[in-house]
Amino acid sequence: MERITLDKIKADENIRALIDGANNNLKEMGYTEHGLRHVGYVSRTTANILRELGYDERTVELGAITGWMHDIGNAVNRKNHGLTGATLAFQLLDNMGMDMREIAVVIGAIGNHEEETGVPVGAVSAALIIADKSDAHRSRVRKDSYDSNDIHDRVNMSINL
């Protein structure tokens, strides 16, 4: 099995296409930014949480990989995007040659990061949930779809006032 790194994940055109597709779909639905800025933030923050808690560097890197890929299911549909994303991630990571035990960590976290249905199923999963939900920034609000009744838009717009 090949050791898959975050750099390999970031360089993969299929993963990039799914991130872009997810972001475009969510833009059309009026959701906040879910593109490279968001996945970069979630990737870094997931890794930082795990590092601060004393996890080994491979677990930290798996957290970073998970953060980068966590929203690819939105390229298909917003509803159940965690489960769809886990299925997509399985195929992509398996094709890249990642160890199946590591794939299980990544897809378990992706499949459980949605607030409606997910629960933290391990350290990477818990760190991902915290990192994802902590991403609040004015730049996430799309200028053409700001909704003062949407809690996500209100929180994001309150940053840096």
Give residue ranges: language-model regions.
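N-terminal glycine-rich anion-binding loops that anchor highly charged ligand groups
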Residues: 13-21, 58-61
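Serine/threonine-rich low-complexity intrinsically disordered regions
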Residues: 2-5, 43, 160
